[in-house]
Every structure is written in C-alpha cells, then in structure tokens.
Amino acid sequence: MAFDLKTEDGLITYLTKHLSLDVDTSGVKRLSGGFVNVTWRIKLNAPYQGHTSIILKHAQPHMSTDEDFKIGVERSVYEYQAIKLMMANREVLGGVDGIVSVPEGLNYDLENNALIMQDVGKMKTLLDYVTAKPPLATDIARLVGTEIGGFVARLHNIGRERRDDPEFKFFSGNIVGRTTSDQLYQTIIPNAAKYGVDDPLLPTVVKDLVDDVMHSEETLVMADLWSGNILLQLEEGNPSKLQKIYILDWELCKYGPASLDLGYFLGDCYLISRFQDEQVGTTMRQAYLQSYARTSKHSINYAKVTAGIAAHIVMWTDFMQWGSEEERINFVKKGVAAFHDARGNNDNGEITSTLLKESSTA
C-alpha cells in the first residue's frame, strides 16, 4: 500500500498503521535542506530497533529545485545498502574507535521509497562551519581533511580488493548513480557559457568524464563527497574537540573512477578557499590529499583528479553563488584552464602542480 510521505498526516499513518510504531506526534518535524528527498525527524514513545528518534527519507523523482532534473527513486536502495556495507566493514571507517561514521540503516521500503535510519542528532554540516563567522578552527579543518582522506582511501582500497564480492558488485548496477553524474557533467558547458567562456575543448572534456563515470569499474566510490553531506559533532562546551564525523547521502554510491571522490572533495575545498576562508579550505585540502596518498594502495592519477576538480569548480561555482560576478567569472576560467592542463598532462599547471607538491609531503 502506498502512502503520501510528503505530508505529516500521511507520514504518521504510514508509521503507525504500516510499521506499527508508537510515534510521539508532537515530535515529528520535516527537515530543511536536501535537493531530492523529503526528510523527517520522528520521535518515538517506544524504541524501534533500539532507537527512540529516527530519520525517514522519502525519495522524490526530481530535484527539489529543478523538476526537469530527473533522478530515479530507486537510488534509495543503494544508500541503504551502502550504509549497511560500511557498518559491516568498520575498518573502512577507521575501526570501532574511529571518528568517521555513517548513520545506521534501519529499514527500506521499496514501494513507498522510504529509507529509515538512525537519527545521529542535531549537528551542523561542515558547510555550515566553513561559511560561519568566525569559520572552523584550522586544527579542526586539518583533522577533518585527514580523517576523510584516510576514509576515502580505505573505501577505494576495499572497493578494488572485493570488486567481485556480491555485496560490493551490487553497486556496479547503480545506473541512477551513474546517470546523475552524467547529468551534472552536462551542466559544464552551459555553466561556462554563462560566464562568457566558450572553449572548444569542453565538449571533449564532458564526453570523457561521462564515458568514464558510465563505464568505469575501477573501485567503489561514495560519489557525493562535499561539505554539505558531512556532519561534525564537536564536544559540548569545547568546540576545539572533534568527536565524530558523519558521512551522509550515499544514494550515488557506485563503482566508478577513484578520481571522482578526489575531485569532488578537493574541488569543494578550492571553492571554500577562494570564497569563504582561504586558510580553512587550503588546510583541509592539503590534509585530505596527504592522508589519501599515505593510505591508498594505488597511485593517484593526477591528470584525472585535476579534471575532477575542474569539473567541480565549473559545475558548482554558479550554483553556490559565492563572491561577486567578476570573482565567479575568474574562478570558472581557472577551472577551464585546469581542463587544458589535465588534457595535456601538464604537471606545471596551477592545480596539478599543487596536487603533486602537497601529496609528496605525505
């Protein structure tokens, strides 16, 4: 039976009648944020799988900000299986004592596109902290970069090693994850044009990026690793103490190029450094890259990572709308220049040379 999980009444009916949960109706709240899901926090009078507060994500078939940007609702099953996989392989997260974690997956209902998971509590995203005044402390930024870089390297290591295991091979079939990346890459040319950049290399760049993400089986990638999908738990009364890092939104998790996770997070760091706080963004980028290089069992393809960073810059500079129009124009031009460096394997290019220098100090 299908329920309307976009409304509070429909949600409560679903939880009480379909799942037989004892819901505290005064503790039901729709959460803001998120581009493609309706998300609720629900307080319970009696525990569900040991939890008295849960999160329910109801998948929508399009972006909340753009109904023409379609995205299959079956993506939620991949998120559910991804967070279950991470909890079953805690060494990827850094072990039981590690500070990197994911919410516990509790239930997935295919008919209603409903994913229920652990409520990890009310905390701010990394994006919230890097855009705050004053911004995140540099020491915390360094620790965040180090921890996430190590986590991603371990994810890529195990993804390569266990590619043929059924529970890993499953993610090769995340067609929505692949096509969503394709749709994002298709924004590169119009985004560049919006800032007056019409470069004949861009169609070739987009084709190469799309071909790679649609067909690569290199390793397991999180594929949506940016500051808006990372929660930080700081010690109460002691904001200089980082207790936990939660990685959210695993819907796009799939087999693909390792450079996707590197380019996405490092590209986000470049945006933060340019438009928010240079020291925080740079520190986090360096720590991430160095930690990844130390932990990864495979060498980094710097040309592909440079292209990934360039793609992130061109795709997201306009979306974030940080800085002035002139600053955004210059930054998009920097991204396009990086495409040329990646294409020509130019180790002396601004971004590529920085990556080589910083990772060599690992």
Curated annotation (Swiss-Prot):
Required cofactor names: Mg(2+)
InterPro entries attached to this UniProt entry: Aminoglycoside_PTrfase (IPR002575), CHK_kinase-like (IPR015897), Kinase-like_dom_sf (IPR011009)
GO MF entries: 4-hydroxytryptamine kinase activity; ATP binding
The enzyme's E.C. designation: 2.7.1.-, 2.7.1.222
Binding site for ATP: 37, 57, 118-120, 249-251
Biotech relevance: The pharmaceutical interesting psilocybin as a treatment option against depression and anxiety is being investigated in advanced clinical trials.
SMART domains listed in its UniProt record: CHK
Xref: Pfam families: APH
Field pH dependence: Optimum pH is 7.0.
GO BP annotations listed: psilocybin biosynthetic process
Resulting phenotype, residue 224 to A: Impairs catalytic activity
Temperature dependence: Optimum temperature is 40 degrees Celsius.
Pathway(s) served: Secondary metabolite biosynthesis
Keyword Magnesium recorded: yes
Keywords, alphabetical: ATP-binding, Kinase, Magnesium, Nucleotide-binding, Transferase
Keyword ATP-binding in record: yes
Catalytic activity: 4-hydroxytryptamine + ATP = norbaeocystin + ADP + H(+); psilocin + ATP = psilocybin + ADP + H(+); 4-hydroxy-N,N,N-trimethyltryptamine + ATP = aeruginascin + ADP + H(+)
Function description: 4-hydroxytryptamine kinase; part of the gene cluster that mediates the biosynthesis of psilocybin, a psychotropic tryptamine-derived natural product. The first step in the pathway is the decarboxylation of L-tryptophan to tryptamine by the decarboxylase psiD. 4-hydroxy-L-tryptophan is accepted as substrate by psiD as well. The cytochrome P450 monooxygenase psiH then converts tryptamine to 4-hydroxytryptamine. The kinase psiK catalyzes the 4-O-phosphorylation step by converting 4-hydroxytryptamine into norbaeocystin.
Quaternary assembly: Monomer.
Family: Belongs to the methylthioribose kinase family.
Name this protein carries in UniProt: 4-hydroxytryptamine kinase
Organism the protein comes from: Psilocybe cubensis
Organism ancestry: Eukaryota, Fungi, Dikarya, Basidiomycota, Agaricomycotina
This protein's encoding gene: psiK
